[in-house]
Amino acid sequence: METAAIAAWTFVSECPIPDDITPLLVDGEQPWAAYKTFRDSAVFTNKRLIVRDAQGLSGKKVEIYSLPYASINMWSSENAGRMLDFNSELELWTRAGHIKVKLNKGVDIRKLDHLISHAVLNS
């Protein structure tokens, strides 16, 4: 099922949950895990995926994507191969469109798959 992605992100490594995510959370929302992206971070909460994208030379301009788990219709995960295929990939089909998430070597695709499964199936 090949469709053009409306967004593509790369998760570089797991990281501590950023302190400055708190103002973005609603009552009852708890952060579960965070990942460093090329330009900022992505945080999985119990309600949604929040991806921050710092822009410009100073990084003061920040675009924030918020993807509620209820909008995810389907997802797939692909683990890395052996020889030349080092990256894993997570794909999300949502009401807004198709989103690709590339995962650098060392990011646990099965942990992410479990996190998405738990969030989507319990939303």
Residue ranges of model-derived segments:
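Short, highly charge-biased, low-complexity peptide segments
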Residues: 97-105
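Phosphoinositide-binding peripheral membrane targeting modules
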Residues: 24-41, 45-98, 114, 118
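Anionic N-terminal interaction surfaces
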Residues: 1-42, 104-106, 110, 118, ...
